[in-house]
Amino acid sequence: MTDLGVAVVVEDDADVRNLVEAVLSQAGFEVHSAADGREGVDVIRRLQADVVTLDVGLPDIDGFEVLRRVRQFSDAYVVMLTARTDELDTLTALHTGADDFMTKPFRPRELRARVAAMMRRPRQDRISETPPVAGAAAPATRAPQDSVLRHNGLELNPDSRTVTVDGASAGLTRSEFDLLHALLKGAGAVRSKADLVRVVRGEYYRADAYIGESDERAVEVHIGNLRRKLRENPLQPRWLQTVRGVGYRLAPERD
């Protein structure tokens, strides 16, 4: 197995499948593939995939249904690919649990960059499952006191990428964690949706890159999912306050 782990390409178009396989193999993954949805679910489960690229328009079950089934047993990073440009596809993918969404034709370098950005931000359980190195000191169970961000009963540890609400763990996706971290660091400053798109896209996303309505809608979906996981009432927010027509900011401190 390669250093980066296992990637599975679920794609019925042989040309696209071969291209994605080459991109991920060159990036350092052990790459496997499937030509339909049911086979894809089986391969992802059997190989315990770390990264999945998933076509929406598969011949048996569509990519959204594949993703629903995969999310029952795996937290693999998932990038959905589609030839359709309907904004509803993007929103459905993010609601279902995709980490990213790209339309065909796509630039191979951009796909590789997006996957690399995801891998630089490991999920909480991927950190906890990392095997210890023989002879190494045990990792700290807590970040330095001044690196933990706290607000209204919520604690975010940027080193372990963990979040707790009133002492209970909140399992967030990479994008949800990054958005929450950005708003907490902003200490009440308004962050525009365009700014938050760049937070989600990661380091490779150029500051002058075009940001469309679908990108901003994707941020809205992530914020909605984040509120649901934090069990926040948007009408009486503890953490995420909407600034109508602009974006979001951290809600005021409560007594």
Please state what every model-predicted region is.
Residues P122-S160:
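CheY-like receiver
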Residues M1-I127, P131-A137:
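N-terminal/domain-start alpha-helical segments
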Residues M1-T2, Q72, V148, P234, ...:
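Short, flexible hinge/linker loops that cap or flank conserved catalytic cores
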